Design a protein with these regions (language model features):
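Helix-loop-strand module that forms the ligand-binding subsite of alpha/beta enzymes
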Residues: 1-58
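Glycine-rich phosphate/pyrophosphate-binding loop and the adjoining helix
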Residues: 60-113
């Protein structure tokens, strides 16, 4: 989250991958959005911007679980371990739901390549 939006580098990468329109790298590829920020609501606004961008790119979005993680020192260790049991459980549940979402999308909108 940068000033309640997505980082410029991420936006630039999405812009490049979104061409040509209609046959871009995101078309029919399921997406889920997770974010963290030191403030309590910064990631929520940034995620809404990202959802709008991905919708324009024709990427089906999982909206049933929204993931707003308040980042605090020590939440993630140097080796990538999530120290909070509740956060780890939430992320595991989120990924299980996302896996099911991918399967549902692939049933309705099979990817051609």
């Amino acid at each position: 989250e940068y000033n309640r939006s997505i980082p410029g580098g991420l936006k630039n990468a999405i812009d490049w991958a979104s061409r040509p329109y209609g046959t871009n790298a995101f078309t029919r590829k399921p997406s889920g959005v997770i974010g963290t920020s030191p403030g309590k609501i910064g990631t929520a606004v940034a995620q809404q911007h990202l959802r709008s961008i991905l919708a324009f790119c024709n990427s089906p979005l999982m909206n049933s679980i929204e993931a707003y993680i308040h980042f605090e020192d020590g939440l993630i260790s140097e080796d990538g371990h999530v120290s909070s049991e509740s956060t780890r459980g939430f992320l595991q549940n989120y990924m299980a739901e996302f896996h099911g979402f991918i399967a549902r999308v692939d049933t309705v909108l099979p990817r051609t390549s």
